[in-house]
Amino acid sequence: MSQQRGYRKSRRGYVTSNSMDKTIVVKIEDRVKHALYGKVIRKTSKVKAHDQGSIAGVGDLVLISETRPISATKRWRLVQILEKAK
């Protein structure tokens, strides 16, 4: 009897730091509309993601996916690098 995994979030963002071992910091930008005034506001959040091969560099556009807790602050993992930094 195999259990199916639940829905896992995936996000796109830019790598802001890769100085930690097997860890990258990804800046995720989200656009939300203000409830009263309707203006579109950019909200950003920074998350730590697991990078097994330490292949992502600063400025890379990456796809990350939610996963089980890897450490005290890591709950995301690197899926693929969408665009390398220039």
Swiss-Prot record:
Under Gene Ontology molecular function, one entry of this record is: structural constituent of ribosome
Annotated coiled-coil positions are none
Q: List the disulfide bonds.
A: none
InterPro entries from the UniProt entry:
NA-bd_OB-fold, Ribosomal_uS17, Ribosomal_uS17_bact/chlr, Ribosomal_uS17_CS
- Tell me where on the tree of life, at the top rank, the source sits: Bacteria
Would the keyword Cell membrane turn up in this protein's UniProt record? Answer: no
Q: What are the record keywords, sorted?
A: Ribonucleoprotein, Ribosomal protein, RNA-binding, rRNA-binding
- Listed GO cellular component terms? cytosolic small ribosomal subunit
- SUPFAM superfamilies this protein is in? Nucleic acid-binding proteins
Gene3D superfamilies in the cross-refs: Nucleic acid-binding proteins (2.40.50.140)
| Family the UniProt entry places it in | Belongs to the universal ribosomal protein uS17 family.
Quaternary structure note:
Part of the 30S ribosomal subunit.
Q: What is this protein called?
A: Small ribosomal subunit protein uS17
Q: Which lineage is the organism of this entry classified under, starting from the top rank?
A: Bacteria, Bacillati, Actinomycetota, Actinomycetes, Micrococcales
Protein encoded by which gene: rpsQ
